[in-house]
Amino acid sequence: MNKSTLLIADIGGTKSDLALFNAGDIRTPQVQRRFINAQYSGVEEILVQFMATVGDVPTVACFAIAGIVSKHQGRMTNLPWEFNCAHLKGRFGFTKVILINDLTAVASCLKHLNPTNPSDIHTILKGRPDGGAVTGVVAPGTGLGEGFVVQCSRETFVTGTEGGHSDFAPVDAEQVALLLWMQKEHKTVSFESLIAGPGLARLYDFCKVYHTMGESTDVMKEMAGKVDRTPAIVAGAIASQPCPLCLKVIELFLRILGSEAGNLALKIYAKGGMYLGGGILPRLMGHVSFDGFVERFLNKGAMSPMLAEIPVTLILNKNAALIGAAGYLVEALSEDGGEE
């Protein structure tokens, strides 16, 4: 078994990315594989298949999961998968296993991103950075991840949260109608239920009725028989001849996301900046205007001038969660601490 190699896993609601990193270079995975979760009964089945292909198995691992982590255990929010560090050690021979929330991993990657590399980040709102102690992260994907980083002297505290499950608050007539429409079938309406996972499909169905808009034949064909309609909606919005309905959906999605990103920035006083993660937003860049996002991010009454000073940055590095989890594990090993 190899002590200098790290096994890193980013376990999302839809897919899982597993990789091996050398402890001295956490920017570049030595081996990387992607697994579609629906094809597996749990993470152990994925691990068995992955390890069969890597040869020399590492002794240390970090699992970043889209779910709740408590001490040495965790469970996924959108999958019936559970994690137990002691069990994983016994089953696979690890000497150390760390379990963290996936947004803890994304937040941990921030210091490893290169601000001058256009493949790593893109500025949405320049702001006036002052090196504040707190930085926030919002990442729409299968779920709506939220997290933050606190820098205190030479110590750094990083954590993911379940803030995406907070109650959706409409800010205009369209969003009031959306809330009432959602409440017909849902007892609670969270931000996650609208701007993550099946949320875009819900926005699509709502906009079709609220704005009395017809559907694109091409988009309907792409959606036919698909459980997840989000890829078709995004593709329709960024096409060379965009689908008007899909574009309307994405514009509403960005406005709601902007509101919630502004909410988080206010709550944690994110003078260190706000970062946007997830797989949807990078696809939109260059095709769809983020003006609606910025407008709603700033629309906080007396606090708008303060928010205008906060830089907002889009994370483009596709391995952000893996890099962050690898960095988290390296630091835990150097301190001989962490969540085992």
PLM features: residue spans?
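Short coil/turn connectors at secondary-structure junctions
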Residues: 3-4, 93-95, 130-135, 144, ...
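Active-site nucleophile and cofactor-binding loops and adjacent substrate-binding regions
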Residues: 35-38, 76-80, 98-105, 125-128, ...
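A short secondary-structure junction signal
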Residues: 110, 147-151, 206
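Short beta-strand segments
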Residues: 62-66, 100, 135-143, 147, ...
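Glycine-rich phosphate-binding loop of actin/hexokinase-like ATP-binding domains
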Residues: 117-124, 128-192, 285, 293-298, ...
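ATP-binding/phosphotransfer module of carbohydrate and carboxylate kinases, centering on a glycine-rich
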Residues: 1-57, 177-340
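Conserved phosphate-binding catalytic cores of ATP/NTP-utilizing and phosphoryl-transfer enzymes
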Residues: 1-2, 48, 99-135
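Short beta-strand-loop/turn "lid" adjacent to the catalytic site in phosphate-handling enzymes
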Residues: 54-117, 282-286
